[in-house]
């Protein structure tokens, strides 16, 4: 079988459309529920097929014209061809199905999906990949399914306007650098304070010369307020000029809900969507159910994104994070916002939990905000610690479901899970889930 017709029934985690062909599941990227498409079967496995669209015979009513000229080629977005309400509906269904499949979480425990009010122009961070071909600069993102760099359009539709201005300026000045092939990537980030910070990845043998070049072009980078050079791992980052950190706001619990201002330095983590981060923090605060005197442990705490809003309401908080500079940021953020009764420790989440338990510490609530790989090592330690509540923030439903399964076996039950659309135009799903000890 090389060509076939297939009706797309739904969307799957990973972004592809799902249908059935001769009894087999078939996944076809860039299709929409209701599409009738002619496909070429590209992958034929014993249990599933993967197809490539040759022709759309009957378009879905959910289908729209994607606004980006490189959509479908660029690996950044998967759903620009869908109306936003259809994207949100698909994400809610995928989230519900995934939690049931991996964690046996009932549908009634999943709250309505929190849609974004800014489905475009929301990304405050971007990693621009760079290659040179025939003396011409190509700067953008990886082609879907490869490490081949394609040019981003003049305006990436999901990036903050400040990021797009920076891309424009960099394209004008980078051709003057004497070692163009020694810069494979430039990270750009913007804060709600209006600053734009760059981290230039340099793989040459003369970082001093590279730093001198980026100092010399400062007048030509009107959109940029700080540059750093990274010559290896994150601990190699060196300051070149300008600002060292960016800031954004989150809701607080003290002083009638006064917002908190949090900063993070180059190399530190922040959510890519500041508006939806505030939605996420608000939901976490509600689910945590903490107040004055309650003991809270925040694992993977970063710069205090959840820790400090919780502590602003009087909770006694310990934050754990293995990236030392983020711990420094969290301490500075606590001081800046006048928040006491907090302790931040630079240590791995699982090791930190073990040490705190061995020291006789106990906690009413534990917050987890792990990376995409989940918290496999930490959740077992948290279960032994036996807090009354666990609030689990996740950016990957399958690893969330896996870890919820571990906690269920340890005597916890899921009482509420909230999906949040942090990443419109993609299949990625952020969420926050509350578990209570039975």
Swiss-Prot record:
InterPro entries: MeTrfase_TrmA_AS (IPR030390), MeTrfase_TrmA_CS (IPR030391), NA-bd_OB-fold (IPR012340), SAM-dependent_MTases_sf (IPR029063), TRAM_dom (IPR002792), U5_MeTrfase_fam (IPR010280). S-adenosyl-L-methionine binds at residues 271, 300, 321, 369. [4Fe-4S] cluster binds at residues 68, 74, 77, 156. The keyword Oxidoreductase does not apply. One of its GO terms (biological process) is rRNA base methylation. Keywords: 4Fe-4S, Iron, Iron-sulfur, Metal-binding, Methyltransferase, S-adenosyl-L-methionine, Transferase. GO terms for molecular function: 4 iron, 4 sulfur cluster binding; metal ion binding; rRNA (uridine-C5-)-methyltransferase activity. Its EC number is 2.1.1.-. It comes from the Bacteria. Residues 1-55 form the TRAM domain. SUPFAM superfamilies: Nucleic acid-binding proteins (SSF50249), S-adenosyl-L-methionine-dependent methyltransferases (SSF53335). The active site is at residue 395. It holds the Pfam family tRNA_U5-meth_tr. It is an enzyme of class 2 (transferase). Belongs to the class I-like SAM-binding methyltransferase superfamily. RNA M5U methyltransferase family. This is Uncharacterized RNA methyltransferase GSU1748. The lineage of its organism: Bacteria, Pseudomonadati, Thermodesulfobacteriota, Desulfuromonadia, Geobacterales.
């Amino acid at each position: 079988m090389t060509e076939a017709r297939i009706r797309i029934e739904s969307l799957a985690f990973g972004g592809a459309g799902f249908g059935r062909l001769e009894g087999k599941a078939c996944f076809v990227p860039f299709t929409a529920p209701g599409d009738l498409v002619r496909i070429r079967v590209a992958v034929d496995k014993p249990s599933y097929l993967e197809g490539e669209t040759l022709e759309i015979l009957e378009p879905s009513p959910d289908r729209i014209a994607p606004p980006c000229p490189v959509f479908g080629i660029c690996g950044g977005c998967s759903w620009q061809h869908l109306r936003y309400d259809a994207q949100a509906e698909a994400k809610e269904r995928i989230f519900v199905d995934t939690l049931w499949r991996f964690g046996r979480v009932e549908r009634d425990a999943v709250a309505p999906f929190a849609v974004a009010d800014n489905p475009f122009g929301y990304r405050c961070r971007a990693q621009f990949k760079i290659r040179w071909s025939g003396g011409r600069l190509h700067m953008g993102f990886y082609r879907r399914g490869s490490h081949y760099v394609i040019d981003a359009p003049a305006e990436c539709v999901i990036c903050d306007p400040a990021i797009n201005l920076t891309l424009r300026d960099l394209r004008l000045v980078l051709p003057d650098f004497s070692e163009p092939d020694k810069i494979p990537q430039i990270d750009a980030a913007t804060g709600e304070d209006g600053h734009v910070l760059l981290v230039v990845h340099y793989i040459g043998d003369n970082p001093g010369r590279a730093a001198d070049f980026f100092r010399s072009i400062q007048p030509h980078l009107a959109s940029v307020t700080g540059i750093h050079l990274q010559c290896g791992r994150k601990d190699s980052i060196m300051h070149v000029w300008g600002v060292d950190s960016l800031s954004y706001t989150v809701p607080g619990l003290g002083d009638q809900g006064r917002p908190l201002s949090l900063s993070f330095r180059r190399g530190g983590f922040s959510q890519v969507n500041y508006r939806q981060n505030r939605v996420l923090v608000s939901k976490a605060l509600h689910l945590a159910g903490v107040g004055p005197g309650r003991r809270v442990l925040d694992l993977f705490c970063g710069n205090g994104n959840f820790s400090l809003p919780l502590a602003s309401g009087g909770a006694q908080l310990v934050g754990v994070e293995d990236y030392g500079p983020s711990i420094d940021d969290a301490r500075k953020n606590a001081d800046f916002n006048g928040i006491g009764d907090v302790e931040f420790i630079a240590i791995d989440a699982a090791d930190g939990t073990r040490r705190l338990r061995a020291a006789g510490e106990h906690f009413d609530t534990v917050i987890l905000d792990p990376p995409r790989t989940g918290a496999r090592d930490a959740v077992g330690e948290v279960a032994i610690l036996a807090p009354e509540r666990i609030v689990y923030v996740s950016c990957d439903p399958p690893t969330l479901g896996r870890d919820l399964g571990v906690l269920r076996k340890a005597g916890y039950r899921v009482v509420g899970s909230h999906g949040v659309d942090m990443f419109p135009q993609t299949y990625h799903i952020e969420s926050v889930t509350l578990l209570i000890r039975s």
